[in-house]
Amino acid sequence: MTEKRAVILLSGGLDSATVVAMAKAEGYSCYTMSFDYGQRHRAELNAAARVARDLGVVEHKVIGLNLDGIGGSALTDSSIDVPEAPGEGIPVTYVPARNTVFLSLALGWAEVLEARDIFIGVNAVDYSGYPDCRPEFVEAFERMANLATKAGVEGQGFRIQAPLQNMSKAQIVQAGMARGVDYSLTVSCYQADDDGRACGKCDSCRLRADGFKAAGIEDPTRYF
């Protein structure tokens, strides 16, 4: 039987950890990729490594990028404050072209591994309104992937899988718990401290806390 491989974007947060567990449950050999891109919340990289070990991935790769050299986001530019109150429109925590860049590098690794599936934990229900989390973006990237690669042109094809796309945060938490995810290992906060403790005020913290509450599951998040 041919090994079924998948490359999975793993930030170290709740959503991406759930996606790794889902892919593993579907029988994939999981190869996870994280990015050190100059983000404010670098504690998520330690969380990603913990999750990768705990879920038994085949290989965990960390790619260095200099997105802070571009700036334009509260997550990569320390002069822009992370908002602690809900706002309207696309928030300043949006990182320009981030998921496009991340998926492109995951696509390259997938082609080398001869993996046909790339998983990403984007969500368009309980989310911050980022344009690169929408179903239209995922579908467009998949079309591009199959036009721009040797494997795609030769008919092997890639699938961009976003299994959380239409799930609420509560449903995501429940799905992860059912598959053995230890959420105490994860970090979601946009301004977590070096120990991975959360602020409890940013949009990501609010979405996470609301998800656990709605799911009726104790939230293991540590706060500073």
UniProtKB/Swiss-Prot annotation:
Cofactor note (record): Binds 1 zinc ion per subunit.
GO terms of molecular function: ATP binding; ligase activity, forming carbon-nitrogen bonds; zinc ion binding
Keywords: ATP-binding, Ligase, Metal-binding, Nucleotide-binding, Queuosine biosynthesis, Zinc
Cofactor: Zn(2+)
Catalyzed reactions: 7-carboxy-7-deazaguanine + NH4(+) + ATP = 7-cyano-7-deazaguanine + ADP + phosphate + H2O + H(+)
Chain positions recorded as Zn(2+) binding sites: 189, 199, 202, 205
GO biological process: queuosine biosynthetic process
UniProt keyword Zinc, yes or no: yes
UniProt-listed Gene3D superfamilies: HUPs (3.40.50.620)
Pathway recorded for this protein: Purine metabolism; 7-cyano-7-deazaguanine biosynthesis
Membrane spanning stretches: none
Binding, ATP: 10-20
Superkingdom of origin organism: Bacteria
InterPro entries in alphabetical order: QueC, Rossmann-like_a/b/a_fold
Enzyme Commission designation: 6.3.4.20
Function: Catalyzes the ATP-dependent conversion of 7-carboxy-7-deazaguanine (CDG) to 7-cyano-7-deazaguanine (preQ(0)).
Similarity comment text for this entry: Belongs to the QueC family.
Family annotation (NCBIfam families): 7-cyano-7-deazaguanine synthase QueC (TIGR00364)
Protein name as it appears in the record: 7-cyano-7-deazaguanine synthase
Organism of derivation: Pseudomonas putida (strain ATCC 47054 / DSM 6125 / CFBP 8728 / NCIMB 11950 / KT2440)
Annotated gene: queC
